[in-house]
UniProtKB/Swiss-Prot annotation:
The lineage of its organism: Eukaryota, Metazoa, Chordata, Craniata, Vertebrata. SUPFAM superfamilies: Fe-S cluster assembly (FSCA) domain-like. GO terms for cellular component: cytosolic [4Fe-4S] assembly targeting complex; nucleoplasm. The keyword Cell cycle does not apply. The gene is Ciao2a. Keywords: Chromosome partition, Cytoplasm, Metal-binding, Zinc. This is Cytosolic iron-sulfur assembly component 2A.
Amino acid sequence: MERVSGLLSWTLSRVLWLSGFSEHGAAWQPRIMEEKALEVYDLIRTIRDPEKPNTLEELEVVTESCVEVQEINEDDYLVIIKFTPTVPHCSLATLIGLCLRVKLQRCLPFKHKLEIYISEGTHSTEEDINKQINDKERVAAAMENPNLREIVEQCVLEPD
């Protein structure tokens, strides 16, 4: 009977560990995702606003809570950013999204898939903008425009 109880206990602990509910799995997985989310936030918080002399962090366009990282598999992560424009009719929301994408594509040290959205209910044309900033062809076309590329470069430039 003791042997059966031990086997049952071992089996249950393995199932819980593999599903992420054990002492080690439960603490380990969220901690890694939190660290990666902070790493992402540290990269985007210093992006400058296209029309104001402030960073996106200072304007609360991005906050720590707007970054989510999920594990896709062992070496790949899904990074989701939900930013909040300063006003619901912000004409530069698409440009801000482009700056976020460019900075993260260049600087993230781990393999990732990137999804960038305007926080729900914070912009009058959020659906259209969300489509634009998550469309690879539109992003590539935007970065071919020398004037737009120069603005993006100025916004993502690291402060001294």
